[in-house]
Amino acid sequence: MVGFSHQIQVRHIVVDKKEVAELLKATLNEVKSANGRTKMLMRLAEKYSLCPSKEDGGNLGWIELASDDPRITEYDPVLKNVELEKVIRQGVRDFTMKVGEVFGPVETQEGFHLILITQEFGSDRSTAFTGSAL
């Protein structure tokens, strides 16, 4: 039997200056729809991001946040940048990161990141099972 699993898909842009990240964030926040923000972030990532993920629109992939499987007590890092992954996991846990909203800039050893959760699957944030895709 398959158990409950909470996963998010994350995209990001990383730049070397906080001021640039703030300008990019302002540009993203001008877009009214979450779907439009995702598309804009993908274009901006391809043009400005320092991360190799820019070739795929800043896609960092899926991160599993929770499971009702008692055998899973800890999660191995999914991202190469463990520092960034910790920020993402904490932001989702604290409800400061939400699907479709731009989060950041967040500074790591790689630079300044803007983070966007583009999809959420199996959210435990409500009573209903969600598989929302933007």
Predicted regions, residues:
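Acidic/polar surface patches and capping/hinge elements
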Residues: M1-Q9
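Peptidyl-prolyl cis-trans isomerase
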Residues: D16-A133
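Glycine-rich loop/hinge motif
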Residues: I13
